[in-house]
Structure formats: C-alpha cells, structure tokens
C-alpha cells in the first residue's frame, strides 16, 4: 500500500522547489492538493494525488537570483556568523552585478539576501562557485541525484 508523504517532499521530488521553499509556499497558501489550497505544514499526501504550485509561486521563483562567481583564495563559500572570515557573497556588489540578456527586460532588483552556495570551496581554494536563492538549482548541482560532474585540480608543493 502506498504511504502518504509530506507535500513538501513531493514538490521537491517533482523538481518544483526545495522542501524549505515548499514549506514557505504552503504557509503562503500557494500550494494545492487535488485543487484545494493547503496551508498546514506537514500535510501529507499520496504521490498519486495532484500537488501543484499556484502561479504566484512561479512568479516568486522567477525573481530568485543565481550568481556564478570565480571565488578567489581568502574568501569562504558560506556566510560566516562569527564575522571572522570574508564570505564570497560579499564580492557581489551593485557595480559588478549583471543580468543575463534573457532576463534583462525584467528589471530585477539587486538583492543578494539568502544567497546560499551550491557546493563549497575552502578558504585556500579558488574556482567556480554558484550562489543561489533557488533551491531547485542547488539540488540540481549538489543534490543526491545530481549527475553534474565536479572536477578539482589540486597543486601540492
């Protein structure tokens, strides 16, 4: 017999959003189960049921920012609560922020709040770092089912 699972897990498995984002959408009343709005966190459903995001959730998702950054040595990938180290996200400022041609007509606000690294490079490493507000992108890059290959070049003295 099929087991009921949390709606947030179903939405994540469908690739519509991360579990955390799903919880936010549920709280905002932007998720439907068989056509009825769901607002209670932890609500369970069967995978055979129809779970959907409302259009307002898609609008929220389209405003999320993803940044590709060449992280230099001396910066950390994540935010530092102790303020002892400089986070790579601090390198992203209005003066060096560019919008892709595909999204230039949307006139996005410069907003880097909530950027999270999709992967990590330690303080002594440099290289490509993806910072995103979109859980779908993070899951695609570093999730358990990710097929994206990561390559590291290590130099030893």
Which positions does each model-derived feature cover?
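Basic, flexible Lys/Arg- and Gly-enriched helix-loop patches that mediate nucleic-acid binding at interfaces
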Residues: 2-157
């Amino acid at each position: 017999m099929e087991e009921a699972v949390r709606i947030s897990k179903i939405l994540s498995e469908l690739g519509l959003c991360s579990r955390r984002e799903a919880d936010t959408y549920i709280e905002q009343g932007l998720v439907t189960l068989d056509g009825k709005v769901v607002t209670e966190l932890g609500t369970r459903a069967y995978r055979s049921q129809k779970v959907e995001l409302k259009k307002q959730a898609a609008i929220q998702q389209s405003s999320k920012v993803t940044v590709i950054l060449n992280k230099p040595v001396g910066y950390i990938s994540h935010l530092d609560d102790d303020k002892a180290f400089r986070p790579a996200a601090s390198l992203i400022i209005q003066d060096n922020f560019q919008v892709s041609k595909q999204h230039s007509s949307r006139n996005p606000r410069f907003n880097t709040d909530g950027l999270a690294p999709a992967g990590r490079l330690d303080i002594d490493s440099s290289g490509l770092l993806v910072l995103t507000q979109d859980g779908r992108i993070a899951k695609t890059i570093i999730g358990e089912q990710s097929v994206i290959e990561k390559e590291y070049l290590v130099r030893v003295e």
